[in-house]
């Protein structure tokens, strides 16, 4: 082989190697920036503690998120300087996410967060039922009675009703229902501590817990923002005048599971600790989980003279100063016997 032929052969080989390298780099670049094979929106990958990089890549391939060579994943991790720095946890793989974005999330520990919303007006039993259905949440309250649950969240001896602030709480896989309950309990206690000192003067409420009880009644009586303070005002004036509160939601709560969607006359006369038709003052505990607006209404009731109200049937209420006026309103809006 002549020297010229040798040089030509070397040149061809170098060109071939350059072509291979360029092709490989282009293919690698395409891999790092191309979306993963996500089959459904909301899919996720759960990386266990102590997983090696090789195991992570194998898991991605096993879930059909990637068919790329493990070498490409290794090169990308080295290029991003995240090799050996990937955190365990559940990571979202939404449509359009790229390998580069996924590794960046894993390196930063940006695990998938879910939200759980406690709805204003839920009872504690309804809250527990909703938690039981929450996905990716450890259910540690199973088999525990209410007293045991309160003890587990550091509130031993407290009645649970009303003690949890309706709000949206973020959680990640591995969190438990007890974690959410504890956060909601702390949030409610903090809210009462913040709002109680600024309450209106001379309210017939001795403690923040009294305010919580009244707020829970307001919460169950109306969902309208423009009526909360009005209804709170009615109840405050009735308390000041030593009148029975006579509010149906407390009766319903006291009936427990025997309530089947309708109150009968006998229910109003059957005494329970929560029957405000037979017992004076506030019931012994809240009857639901009041939201912050209802608590504000209880602490800042609207001034006025109304002592009664009745539902119109459209979500609003009509208010009355006297029993005679209330009787006419009941006949009109409840019995549909409006006088002309």
Predicted regions and their residues:
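Short low-complexity stretches enriched in small and charged residues
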Residues: 11-14, 42, 83-85, 122-125, ...
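N-terminal start-of-chain detector that recognizes signal peptides
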Residues: 16-19, 64-65, 88-90, 140-143, ...
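Short alpha-helical segments used as structural interaction elements across diverse proteins
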Residues: 4-5, 71, 323
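Signal peptide-directed extracytoplasmic domains
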Residues: 25-193
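Bacterial extracytoplasmic/cell-wall-associated proteins, especially those involved in peptidoglycan
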Residues: 52, 129, 133-141, 151-340
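A broad, low-specificity signal for short, low-complexity segments enriched in glycine/proline
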Residues: 4-8, 50-55, 75-79, 88, ...
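N-terminal type II signal-anchor transmembrane helix
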Residues: 2-40
């Amino acid at each position: 082989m002549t020297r010229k032929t040798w040089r030509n052969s070397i040149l061809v080989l170098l060109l071939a190697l350059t072509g291979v390298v360029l092709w490989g780099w282009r293919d690698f670049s395409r891999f790092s920036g191309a979306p993963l094979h996500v089959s459904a929106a909301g899919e996720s990958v759960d990386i266990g503690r102590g997983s090696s990089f090789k195991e992570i890549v194998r898991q991605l391939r096993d879930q059909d998120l990637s068919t790329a060579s493990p070498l490409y994943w290794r090169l990308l991790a080295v290029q991003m300087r995240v090799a050996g720095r990937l955190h365990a946890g559940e990571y979202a793989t939404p449509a359009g996410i790229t390998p580069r974005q996924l590794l960046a999330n894993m390196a930063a520990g940006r695990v998938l967060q879910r939200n759980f919303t406690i709805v204003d007006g839920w009872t504690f039993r309804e809250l527990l039922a909703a938690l039981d259905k929450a996905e990716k949440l450890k259910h540690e309250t199973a088999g525990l009675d209410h007293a045991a649950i309160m003890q587990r969240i550091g509130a031993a001896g407290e009645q649970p009703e009303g003690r949890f602030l309706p709000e949206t709480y973020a959680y990640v896989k591995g969190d438990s229902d007890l974690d959410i309950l504890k956060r909601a309990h702390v949030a409610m206690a903090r809210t009462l501590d913040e709002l109680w000192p600024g309450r209106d003067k001379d309210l017939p409420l001795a403690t923040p817990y009294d305010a919580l009880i009244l707020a829970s009644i307001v919460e169950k009586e109306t969902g309208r923002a423009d009526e909360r303070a009005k209804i709170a005002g009615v109840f405050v004036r009735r308390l000041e005048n030593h009148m029975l509160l006579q509010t149906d939601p407390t009766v319903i709560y006291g009936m427990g599971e025997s309530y089947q969607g309708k109150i009968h006359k006998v229910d109003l006369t059957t005494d329970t600790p929560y029957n405000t038709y037979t017992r004076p003052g506030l019931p012994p505990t809240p009857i639901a989980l009041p939201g912050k607006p209802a608590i504000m209404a209880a602490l800042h009731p609207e001034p006025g003279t109304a002592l009664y109200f009745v539902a119109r049937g459209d979500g609003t209420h009509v208010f009355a100063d006297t029993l005679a006026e209330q009787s006419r309103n009941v006949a009109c809006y409840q019995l549909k016997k409006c006088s002309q």
